[in-house]
C-alpha cells in the first residue's frame, strides 16, 4: 500500500485538504513537509508522539521532513484547544525550552539520510526580525477578520475572550508555511487535529501570494482512551519524553497498562510493526487476553524508540524485580528509578531495630502496630518477608550501601535512604 493508504490504515489521518492531489504528489515526487512544535514546557510529551512518528514515517517513505521549533510562536501562544488565555513565558525561558525540544526531536529523525535528510528550524529566525509594518502589509493584508473569526480556535473563545496576541497566532503560523514554501519548497504541513484552522490559514496565504500553488495539509486525530480519561496523563502527572521528568520505567509502565480496548490502535499509531504483525497480536489478544502480549510488545517498542535498548532493558528488569520481589539484584540507578515516586525516609545513623524504623519512617503508625505487622507477615525488607519483631537492620540490609526497600502488605512500598 502507498504511504497515505498506510497512514489511513493506521488511523493517522483525520483530515486532508485534497486527498487525491496529496496521494498523487506523494506517489510521484519527493515531498518536503513540516510540523511545528511550540516550546510550552521544557520537554515534549507523549501527546506529541503520534505527530513526531508520522514525520518519521514520511522520511522512511523517502520524503524530507522539517521539524519547526516555535521559538517565536511560543512567545505568543496558540489558542487552539485552549479555553482560556495562555500565560506568556519569558523570552529566555522559551529559548531554553526551544533548545531542549530541538534535542528531543533530533532522536526521531535522520539528519544524515542520503537524499532526504531531515532538518530542524526555529521560526524565531524569520519572525524575530520581522517589523510590525512589514508583517501587517505582507501578511495581515491577506486575512479578513471575518475569515479569522470563523475559525474554531477563535469561535470557541468568543464568550470567554481572546487577546489580539492570540488572535494573531494563526497569521504567524500561516507565515511559517509561506516562508518554508518559499525557502525549502515545503508543500505539506502536518499537525494535530486542533491545527486544522492554522494549517488552512497557511494554505490560504500561499494561494493569495503565489497564485494556484500546490500545497497541502494533513491532520492527525487526537489520541483518545476508551475509558474517557485524557491520554498521556496518569495520577502522577504528564508522561514526558525527557527521562529526567518521566523515568524509562514509568514510561514503560504507562504503555504496559494500556486498556485492551486501546492497545491495537496504539500499536498502529506508535510502532513501526507491520500490518501482519499487528493483526497477529490482535488475534492473540482475542484468544488469550490474559497474556497481555500486545501490551508487552507496545511497551517494549515505544520505550525502545524513545529511550533506547539499554533503558528498555532496565525498565523490564525493574518491572520483573517488583513483580517477583527480587529487589536485591537491582542496581542503585534502577532502585532510584523504580522507587522514584514512593514515600522515602532518610535514616541517620547505623544499625536500627526494624520496629523503630517502621514507626519513624511512617510505615506503621505505632510500635504496637509495627510489631503486629511484622508478626502477621506484612513486612518485606528488600523483597524478603521478615517476621522477627526483634530484627535489627544492619549494613547487610543496605542495597548498594545506600537503600533499603520496605514493603508493607501487597503493594505499599517505602524507600529508606541512608545519610
Swiss-Prot record:
UniProt protein name: Tyrosine--tRNA ligase
Result of altering residue 173 to A: Destabilizes the transition state for the second step of the reaction
Species this chain originates from: Geobacillus stearothermophilus
GO biological process: regulation of protein complex stability; tyrosyl-tRNA aminoacylation
Phenotype when changing residue 410 to N: Decreases the binding of tRNA(Tyr), without affecting the formation of Tyr-AMP. Abolishes the toxicity
Effect upon mutating residue 45 to A: Does not affect the second step of the reaction
Classification via InterPro entries: aa-tRNA-synth_I_CS (IPR001412), aa-tRNA-synth_Ic (IPR002305), Rossmann-like_a/b/a_fold (IPR014729), S4_RNA-bd (IPR002942), S4_RNA-bd_sf (IPR036986), SYY-like_C (IPR054608), Tyr-tRNA-ligase (IPR002307), Tyr-tRNA-ligase_bac-type (IPR024088)
Key words of the record: Aminoacyl-tRNA synthetase, ATP-binding, Cytoplasm, Ligase, Nucleotide-binding, Protein biosynthesis, RNA-binding, tRNA-binding
Amino acid at each position: 500500500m502507498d504511504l497515505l493508504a498506510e497512514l489511513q490504515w493506521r488511523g493517522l489521518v483525520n483530515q486532508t485538504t485534497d486527498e487525491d492531489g496529496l496521494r498523487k504528489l506523494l506517489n510521484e515526487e519527493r515531498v518536503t513537509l513540516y510540523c511545528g512544535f511550540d516550546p510550552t514546557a521544557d520537554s515534549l510529551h507523549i501527546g506529541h508522539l503520534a505527530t513526531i512518528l508520522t514525520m518519521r514515517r514520511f522520511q522512511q517513505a523517502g520524503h524530507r521532513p522539517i521539524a519547526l521549533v516555535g521559538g517565536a510562536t511560543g512567545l505568543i501562544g496558540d489558542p487552539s484547544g485552549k479555553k482560556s488565555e495562555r500565560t506568556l513565558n519569558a523570552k529566555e525561558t522559551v529559548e531554553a525550552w526551544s533548545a531542549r525540544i530541538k534535542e528531543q526531536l533530533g532522536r526521531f529523525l535522520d539528519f544524515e539520510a542520503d537524499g532526504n535528510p531531515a532538518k530542524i528550524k526555529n521560526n524565531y529566525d524569520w519572525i524575530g526580525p520581522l517589523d510590525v509594518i512589514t508583517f501587517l502589509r505582507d501578511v495581515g493584508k491577506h486575512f479578513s477578520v471575518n475569515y479569522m473569526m470563523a475559525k474554531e480556535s477563535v469561535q470557541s473563545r468568543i464568550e470567554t475572550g481572546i487577546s489580539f496576541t492570540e488572535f494573531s497566532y494563526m497569521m504567524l503560523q500561516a507565515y511559517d508555511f509561506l516562508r518554508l514554501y518559499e525557502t525549502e519548497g515545503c508543500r505539506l504541513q502536518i499537525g494535530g487535529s486542533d491545527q486544522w484552522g492554522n494549517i488552512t490559514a497557511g494554505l490560504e496565504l500561499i494561494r493569495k501570494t503565489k497564485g494556484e500553488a500546490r500545497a497541502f495539509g494533513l491532520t492527525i486525530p487526537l489520541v483518545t482512551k476508551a475509558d474517557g480519561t485524557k491520554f498521556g496523563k496518569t495520577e502522577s502527572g504528564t508522561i514526558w519524553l525527557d527521562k529526567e521528568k518521566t523515568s524509562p520505567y514509568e514510561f514503560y509502565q504507562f504503555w504496559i497498562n494500556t486498556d485492551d480496548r486501546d492497545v491495537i490502535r496504539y500499536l498502529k499509531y506508535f510502532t513501526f510493526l507491520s500490518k501482519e504483525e499487528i493483526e497477529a497480536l490482535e488475534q492473540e489478544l482475542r484468544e488469550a487476553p490474559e497474556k497481555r502480549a500486545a501490551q508487552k510488545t507496545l511497551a517494549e517498542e515505544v520505550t525502545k524508540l524513545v529511550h533506547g535498548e539499554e533503558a528498555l532493558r532496565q525498565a523490564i528488569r525493574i518491572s520483573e524485580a517488583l513483580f517477583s520481589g527480587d529487589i536485591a539484584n537491582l542496581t542503585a540507578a534502577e532502585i532510584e528509578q523504580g522507587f522514584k515516586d514512593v514515600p522515602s525516609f532518610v535514616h541517620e545513623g547505623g544499625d536500627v531495630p526494624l520496629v523503630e524504623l517502621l514507626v519513624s519512617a511512617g510505615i506503621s503508625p505505632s510500635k504496637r502496630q509495627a510489631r503486629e505487622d511484622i508478626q502477621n507477615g506484612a513486612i518485606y525488607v528488600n523483597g524478603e518477608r521478615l517476621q522477627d519483631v526483634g530484627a535489627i537492620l544492619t549494613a547487610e540490609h543496605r542495597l548498594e550501601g545506600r537503600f533499603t526497600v520496605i514493603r508493607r502488605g501487597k503493594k505499599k512500598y517505602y524507600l529508606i535512604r541512608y545519610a
